[in-house]
Amino acid sequence: MISKALISLLTIALSLASTAQQQVTIPIETKDNVLVLQTDADNRLSTIYFGGKLKDSLEYAQIARGYRTDDNNTGISNNAYTPAGTWNLMEPALQVIHGDGNTSTELKYTAHETTRIDANVQLTTVTLKDPVYPFEVKLFYKTYAAENILEQWTEIRHQEKKRVVLKKYASANLYLTGRKFFLTHFAGGWAREMQPEETELSSGIKTLDTKLGARADLFQPPSFYVSMDRPASETEGKVLMGTLAWTGNYKFDFEKDPYGHLRLITGINPFASDYSLDAATTFKTPSFITTLSENGKGEASRNLHSWARKYRLRDGNGRRLTLLNNWEATYFDFDETKLVGLFKGAKDLGVDLFLLDDGWFANKYPRNHDSAGLGDWQENRAKLPHGIGYLVKEATAAGIGFGIWVEPEMVNPKSELYEKHRDWVLRQPERPEHYYRNQLVLDLVNPEVQDFVFGILDTLLTKNPKLAYIKWDCNAVIYDAHSIYLSRKKLPQTHIYVEYVRGLYKVLERVRQKYPAIPMMLCSGGGGRVDYEALKYFTEYWPSDNTDPLERVFIQWNNSYFFPSIASCNHVTNSGNQPLKYKIDVAMMGKPGFDIVVGHLPAEDLAFARQSLKTYDSISNLVWHGDLFRLIDPHENNIASLLYASQDKSRAVMFNYLTNFRTLLAPIIDPVRLNGLDPARNYAIREINRYPGNTGGGLSEKVTYSGDYLMRVGVNPVVTAKRSSVILLIEEVK
């Protein structure tokens, strides 16, 4: 006779077996794509598919059956968030030391929920728990359906008796099936940002990372794309674009598993960043943003641009201001009279505002060069006896706005701030200081320093409510990473790289809460700090200190893979020996500005520049809010050609630039095929922004073309050494 106890045990066993066999399939869909997660018999969560959406969602559950792998490896390679320390032999997404010293973590699926935020946005939250420890990971998947964007992040939390040490804590752990993968990333340095490199990924791990702290993107931005099966073109091929929304150290691991598939682990760089997490405290990772296209790089870029303008970039659907910067006109050598004299040039040029750059502050150690004054944000009385308010007033009287440059995260050793608050500086004890551009980085981990940095902006904007623009610079990396504040609080120094960035965000959040509307440029010694978390607070970014227009064609082209043109600050300067028209036309790829001595321009050049800004105003909505189509790649051809089309397909503007000045004759023989038009409509084409006296390219404004013709056959913009830049306006004829 079977005892009641045995019956009870059998019932429990059968119940557990039944639960284990209840496979959970979680499809996370956008308009065209889907990421499918699925549990196995042990409730481990895997990624079983990332690709085009199926018509019948019930079929997602069958996908995993089509793959055959070694039973000993099943679920390791494609784990949705791979923990370290147990049966995993691959690169982990999560590595933990538990409160009792145990270095292993197991994560099992326990629940998920999907919340519809609005008609386009949906959030899926998946909860994973360790079966032994009170340790929990939540995976967040936010989808933007129309834009085909997937945003991922992770939250880690525990209820253990002692602190848990997080040694690695990725934002995302993706899995791509295939046989060949081609990674394109962007290397470089100061004045040579965004240089593309394409590599076919082989067995093992390819890592992209930075350890620079501030100005973290100096050598490499946190953005890439992976082509599957073959290198993608603008219009063909399967490609995944990804970018991490984090203004600090990052690490991307691309690992081909034993089956030839690709594991992708992205997030904060764990280098020198073990994080001690208290019980009942949540650690949130930054967002990893991806888009998947089966129609080439162009579609993927347009997905990101559309999403950024609508959901991430500050005032992404608004307007932008053109400006004149004083830097190349004066450098540090200016005074009140000289600056006011430049206002007339700004007005004559027709820009919206005048931007005062570096050198306006500090008294005991005047900011007359780059080795003194940073940190002392009072107007220099010798240069500006009547203060910033006087300049704002005079600019307003001249009919232009007034903006100002700051670098609030930094300090020169030769400053009053350094003398009073050496404890506010990141520096190693008992060791000599190391300087980058003669400066050190303030300890934004410290709330007092956060208050100080916020106060710089708050004081300027409170005293001068008509200030029209802020340029926020960041010229140094973090050397000697040590926080006196962390030591005083008895917190690990390994928190410094994470908490510095969080401190920066706290300051920016306060600035935007109080001053939501002021335009702000994100700058970091050029393009050393461009990401989608920082751009929540900034309306635009500075791509590079290299303003040679030929180099800028390439830098701006490569930034366009990830960031919309409305955010790109492109200035006309004295750099480069190309004609003024070429420089202005290149600047029109985004938001143009000027860094010149207007009074030194010949009368005909000034008249052309003024007219160019009026021309730009007539096409600015196309550039800012249109769909970008890259037509001819300058890395592979003698010209660059790109087009912005209105979303209703009624207008487009096409920019063409000569990029090989060794070519004396027409470098382009064949017509350029356009994109973004309606094949059933008719269009007229005319050349705009022509320099007076220059001959046209032979296109008749009286001829109409079907969109079908323009996209299948094309037109020749006739770019030559004498016509080194050509802008064509395409308008529907009704």
Regions found by a protein language model. Name each.
Residues D32, V226, D633-P679:
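Carbohydrate-binding surface patches
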Residues N660-K734:
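C-terminal beta-sandwich/jelly-roll accessory domains of carbohydrate-active enzymes
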Residues Q22-L37, R44-E255, F271, N682-T695:
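Polysaccharide-binding surfaces and accessory modules of carbohydrate-active proteins
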Residues G75, G85-L107, E236-N249, T291-L313, ...:
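Glycine-rich, aromatic-flanked loop segments that form ligand/cofactor-binding clefts
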Residues N412, Y418-D451, V498-H600:
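Glycan-recognition surfaces
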Residues D315-G455, N464, Y469, L486:
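Aromatic-lined carbohydrate-binding/catalytic grooves of carbohydrate-active enzymes
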Residues M1-Q23:
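Bacterial Sec-dependent N-terminal signal peptides
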Residues N102-L107, Y275-E294, R723-E731:
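Short Pro-Gly-centered flexible turn/kink motifs
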